[in-house]
Amino acid sequence: MKKRIKELTDLLNRYRYDYYTKDAPSVSDSDYDKLYRELVTLEQSYPEYVLQDSPTQQVGGTILKGFEKYRHQYPLFSLQDAFSREELDAFDKRVKAEFPNATYLAELKIDGLSISLSYENGFLQVGATRGDGNIGENITENIKKIKDIPHQLSEPLTITVRGEAYMSRQSFKAINEARQENGETEFANPRNAAAGTLRQLDTAVVAKRELATFLYQEASPTARNQQNEVLAELADLGFSVNPYYQLTSSMDEIWDFIKTIEAKRDQLAYDIDGVVIKVNSLAMQEELGFTVKAPRWAIAYKFPAEEKEAEILSVDWTVGRTGVVTPTANLTPVQLAGTTVSRATLHNVDYIAEKDIRIGDTVIVYKAGDIIPAVLNVVMSKRNQQEVMLIPKLCPSCGSELVHFEDEVALRCINPLCPSLIQRSLEHFASRDAMNITGLGPAIVEKLFLAGFVHDVADIYQLTKENFMQLDGIKEKSADKLLAAIEASKSNSAEKLLFGLGIRHIGSKVSRLILEVYGDISALLTAKEEEIARIDGLGSTIAQSLTQYFEQKTAAILVDELKTAGVNMHYSGQKVNSDAALFGLTVVLTGKLNQLNRNEAKDKLEALGAKVTGSVSKKTDLVIAGSDAGSKLEKAKSLGIRIEDEDWLRQL
């Protein structure tokens, strides 16, 4: 029986590969079902012989208790967006300045959810969401319910791959029809449906909803040399790979490809929102490297957003956590990109003045980045003596006079005691990407603030069960859960705390970069601006903002209060040694290395505190030159930059 189970498993997996990956069914549905039922019967009789890659393991359901956090071995970066031909040409110019012979691979940008799949010896071990790029959620059991994801690769490789999980338009339509019949809320669009499906705790629901995938990247080291070779290998391994892509060195040809795809966008079985252009050479990708947020070797062209007309009924002004006052238009409802839109951002006062936006105007509304509704323009032909927009002079929350700094486009409330500013700061501190205090959302924060229980983030750690029980709608069980979540947040790594403080220009990724060097929040109280500016990926604006914040006496008091409350101040990741031999130096690798491969050399340089970049400029401090070094070496010589060889690096 063991042998027959193995035969059936291999045979059915091959048929699945032919059907889902090659789009070339090699067996009839009835024959497949007959073999499948035979395998099910045998596995039920001999459960000890069920194989890890059995197709039966992708059906049925398990109720999951929740999703564990998963730290990605290889971080997932966002892509720089482009919305015009000019931006693509600028990208091309930057790349060709370093690599005149570079070619590009243009691929479809699937409108789905990023996933990471890790295999050991050919077997699927972990499927995870993108999360913040460093930490996602382990959704392996749900991933296994997606039919075109192989449980076992065609080769026994240990590999991590990346791609998009999506829901086809046909599946989306069927699901919404069923939800409508059952009186359930319909999904807004296929992407939302796919996102909700991947986070289902009932795996049977995941299997029933028929998600699909396209894989496009090997995140782990690969023997391939080109991105198009990676796609071919992924297909050979059993993954679904999108068939639409273009290899070229010409931005004109890429633009033609974009326009061709845009024209046939509605004919595809799935949603796309653009085209991703990547440098095809993996070696060139490595040399070009990354910014803090995105690779320098890729760019995502986003299709123009859908636009609709709507009337502005009124405008609300709200205060954010940094004091910025943002105008939001209340609109006559319109259907836009699959959702009903009745509110749209007006950005800031300068934007309102520039566009001459008025109450009662008919305006063009679109979704910026296909996400945030925004007002694009006024339809002047439909204007009929509308009232001029009244720009507030006083804060809508605290009544303080608003300021409009010369170098800013927004109005700002600078009253540190402004109720809205404090509430937004508390909400941000408790948010998922910051201290992740589950349950402490805007509604409860508002109740706590109005009750006088919290005035700054340190007060959160002084809350008692009695405080929560005094709030309307909070029962004992909810209070216990909130207190447990607050207590759990104390052990977060310090970059979560730094981000949670809401310092201007200090995002989650920047917080991690800072703490990798300083290691402890307390060290930032005396950090020097010039030292911070030298950290890879930062600069003078971020450094100035950080030092100005921690120079305030209130910052030292707040840090002390948080420390006294037991909040962790230490960074739990790997710390960069500021005393390292090359700390703060910008280094470029060029030419062929004989003893170290490029990854090893880069890792060593970064371990020594260096920032490794792909291009030589006046900011470069050192060039490590291997054999056959070309234009970068010549440029370094012309700029008088220090040059060393591989042997020098190995001896450090």
Curated annotation (Swiss-Prot):
The keyword Zinc applies. It is an enzyme of class 6 (ligase). The gene is ligA. It comes from Streptococcus pyogenes serotype M49 (strain NZ131). CDD domains: BRCT_DNA_ligase_like, LIGANc. The active site is at 109 (n6-amp-lysine intermediate). Gene3D superfamilies: 5' to 3' exonuclease, C-terminal subdomain, 6.20.10.30, BRCT domain, DNA ligase/mRNA capping enzyme, Helix hairpin bin, Nucleic acid-binding proteins. GO terms for biological process: DNA repair; DNA replication. This is DNA ligase. It holds the Pfam family HHH_5. InterPro entries: BRCT_dom, BRCT_dom_sf, DisA/LigA_HHH, DNA_ligase, DNA_ligase_AS, DNA_ligase_CS, DNAligase_adenylation, DNAligase_N. Its EC number is 6.5.1.2. HAMAP family: DNA_ligase_A.
